[in-house]
Amino acid sequence: MRRLLTLILLLVALPAGAGLFDSRPGASLGGGLDGGGFLKVDQAFKPSVERSDAQHVLLRFVNAEGYYLYRHRFQFKVEPAQVSLGQVQLPAGKQHHDEYFGDTEVYYNIVDLEIPLNNPARQPYTLVVTYQGCADKGLCYPPETRRFDIDGGAATPAASDAAGKGPLEHKGKRSLLFFFLAGLTLTFTPCVLPMLPILSGVVLRGRPGGGRGFVLSLAYVLPMALCFALLGALMGMFGASLNLQAQLQSPWVLVPFAAFFALFAVAMFGFFELRLPGFIREPLDRLAGDARGGSILGAATLGVLSSLLVSPCVSAPLAASLLYISASGDAWGGGLQLFALGLGMGTPLVVFGAGGGALLPKSGAWMNGVRNAFGVLLLAVAVWLLERVVSGPVALMLWGMLAGGAGLALGALEFTPKSAARRLLQLLGLMFLTYAVAAWIGALQGESDPIHPLGRSVPSIHAGPPSTPGEWQNLTTPAQLDAALAEARQAGKPVLLDWYADWCISCKVIERQVLTDPTVQARLPAYRLLRFDITESNPAQRGLLDRYNLFGPPAILFFAPGGDEWSDLRVIGEIDAAGLAERLRRAATRQ
């Protein structure tokens, strides 16, 4: 039963890990969110000129977590005419498949763009950059244009103000929580958990429990976590010095990283052990044996030494974490993440010190399941890294192989008498194996989405703005919108205003999957239906976005018969049919 609970925990952790092992800056602690939880465009995408001379300009974009830029939407020009641009060679991006727009390339995290130019006189000039991006949660920003004034090869300070506001703005609470949970889970491995009573015997002198035990355990755990934090900060600085995060787009970095994660996974499966060299480990063992227990100083000393004596069960995921942090290039963030990891690893010891061994689970064979679960998770990270290098169908094939291997390991095809717990594990294995078969079939058919391996049946779209004939009125100028709103106000009819653009993926989803839903369709006739097309994204249309405090499409606004907006009902980003139907129902009660 404990193995089953461990595997269920793995299933919960996998999607979290898929989102949290992105080497891209987060923004969940930063400001600038609108009512829908989206960042302003200048906070979602932060461009800066890092270096410039007479022949080149290095332009860097720092994208917040969950936001990406389209490779094909970049445009560059320089002013005045005496300075000219060369042929810009954009780096390869991550393959991004959309049901409507097909295969594109996008940039996550940090991307460096090398822009060649001809400026032999080194005269001042202005670099004009146009770009466009979206949020994973379903918001597309209009094309944005930034101007950088460069004085004879050096960017002015105003042009470089997008370099980031501090570590906390780029590290979300989720990553810290994930590292804490990872550390907590690492404790329940075959090598670490049995050591807890031994360690507590040295630190607590065999007297766990009470306030004294809590203080001594805390004195042991905090220095251990601080050592992990120092290690994480150093790895972050090392990664920053090599600019690994920007280089992470390159197959020459991604493939070795994926190989390292796969190697660590094999170590977690018990095929070999990763340990410190003997000439380092043995002196540390002697120091730990000489440390005095029963005192705060002795507990702190043991905590520091314990952080250096990495056991075989912890070294593989710890090394994987260090690789990840070195790629992030964030010293502060790396320190915080490994501090959280250390706190997670030390939490069971604090629990033991405060309440005694009765509060901790007993060691046993179930802990091998934790170790194997970490191996599967590390393999999943390796596949995730390879997704940036290989084609979509190949990546889907790899996900299928991982799921199939996990299913077979759980005994999916072992039809022999089993206990109830093992039958549940076999059922879980059959689910993994079923997904694996679906992934392989989808890959052979050219699919690439691991969430929908067999693809989704979607209707074709027309080139122009979508509309339901005879119902939706399409608008493109502020004057047209004002006139339509005034007409609806005079008629005493509520208005449903849909913001749309051809380049907005989520707009297509809403048009084809939400507005066509029968529960939504049944309530639409009560409204004057307006659709504002912001595809052109001219200054007048962008001014209209500012007027309504919007960042871009999709968005749906509700207006009362008297012309006032029901702001609590507005939709920003994607929404499903049930959510929109509920808003329509609430609006109907106000008429």
Swiss-Prot record:
Top-level taxonomic group: Bacteria
Residue spans, topological domain Periplasmic: 19-175, 235-251, 317-338, 387-392, 445-591
Domain Thioredoxin: residue ranges: 452-589
GO process annotations (BP): cell redox homeostasis; cytochrome complex assembly
Gene Ontology molecular function terms on file: electron transfer activity; protein-disulfide reductase [NAD(P)H] activity; protein-disulfide reductase activity
Alphabetized UniProt keyword annotations: Cell inner membrane, Cell membrane, Cytochrome c-type biogenesis, Disulfide bond, Electron transport, Membrane, NAD, Oxidoreductase, Redox-active center, Signal, Transmembrane, Transmembrane helix, Transport
GO cellular component: plasma membrane
Membrane topology of this protein: Multi-pass membrane protein
EC number per UniProt: 1.8.1.8
Short name of any one Pfam family annotated for the protein: DsbD_TM
Disulfides per UniProt: 134-140, 191-313, 504-507
Annotated TM spans: 176-196, 214-234, 252-272, 296-316, 339-359, 366-386, 393-413, 424-444
Catalyses which reaction(s): [protein]-dithiol + NAD(+) = [protein]-disulfide + NADH + H(+); [protein]-dithiol + NADP(+) = [protein]-disulfide + NADPH + H(+)
Signal peptide stretch: 1-18
Membrane topology (Cytoplasmic): 197-213, 273-295, 360-365, 414-423
Subcellular localization, as worded in the UniProt entry: Cell inner membrane
Similarity comment: Belongs to the thioredoxin family. DsbD subfamily.
NCBIfam families assigned: PRK00293.1
PANTHER family (UniProt xref): THIOL:DISULFIDE INTERCHANGE PROTEIN DSBD
Annotated function: Required to facilitate the formation of correct disulfide bonds in some periplasmic proteins and for the assembly of the periplasmic c-type cytochromes. Acts by transferring electrons from cytoplasmic thioredoxin to the periplasm. This transfer involves a cascade of disulfide bond formation and reduction steps.
Protein name: Thiol:disulfide interchange protein DsbD 1
